[in-house]
Amino acid sequence: MDDLLASIGLTHGTRSSRKGTWTEGARKPVGKKKKLAAETTKVPTPKIDFDFSSLLAKAPAVVHGFSTRSGGVTRVYRPGLPKSQGDLNLGFTSHDERKNVEANRTRMMQALLGKEAKDWKLVTLQQRHTPVVRVLRDTEATHLRGDAVMTDLPHRLLGVMTADCIPVLLYDRKNGAVAAFHAGWRGTLARIVERGVGTMKIEYGTDPKDIVAAIGAGIGPCCYSVGEEVRHEFESQFAYAPELFSDVYESEPIRDKYPLLFMTARAPGHSPIGPQLHLDLWEANRRQLLDAGISAKKISVVGTCTACGTSRYFSHRTEEGFTGRMMSVIGVR
């Protein structure tokens, strides 16, 4: 038997194969060792989504983006998310830990800038719904008070935070200046965007015809109900104010599905419960940009309502104040 086994290259207690020789009972190869795959799998970093302006995206010298709520480490607002997911809260709110916000800001800049992130500084504002416009001249400044900021310094990412208010970004193609605005109804009423364009004229010699503008996601006319006092305020400032307001009746799903059950009900407009007054802040800020001399062809509007889309955006109104903040950013290389 031994002679027979030897004739085919085998002996008692061993087996031959193409990958080496194993001794009977052994688990590891005696010949060339084979690396074993790691038993653990690296969890990928959640994707960070941005909204972008198609117009600003055509300018290679500009970096911009409107953040959404996905891809961060914050879990306080949606604790039911899978452990591998979190919100990208970019504002220092009273609910979230500072370390989470700092980690989220780092992620945001890396996602937007890649390897360039280390060369950039993030400049933010202490926002108070004012018409205050700040000009960044100091290369070391990173936090200012106001609701708009502009600069022509390179590698400065200007950021405004929102959770329903309207973010507006501007780029002067000729002079290489950029600006970011936080426009709630008070800032819009105070013409903060128009003021900003005027400041750019003084600071950089900007011609409005050279400006490209982008209006980001915010609460839309579908959801932004306001009081009559707000309408009166706008009518005192803008001749076109009536075009910014609309009467909206609340949807009644049961009535819509079973109209025959409500045949004896009063027609819309004749019910004791009247319509709600809604304001279109997107259009209000677009009109200000037009009045400032910017061409309609150079104004882009994301047109997505934050109050309707809380799976993608933070909304102060829909989430009753318990929410994070998005950040809209712009800078020049």
Give the label of every model feature segment:
Residues M1-R333:
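Active-site microenvironment for binding and transforming phosphate-containing groups
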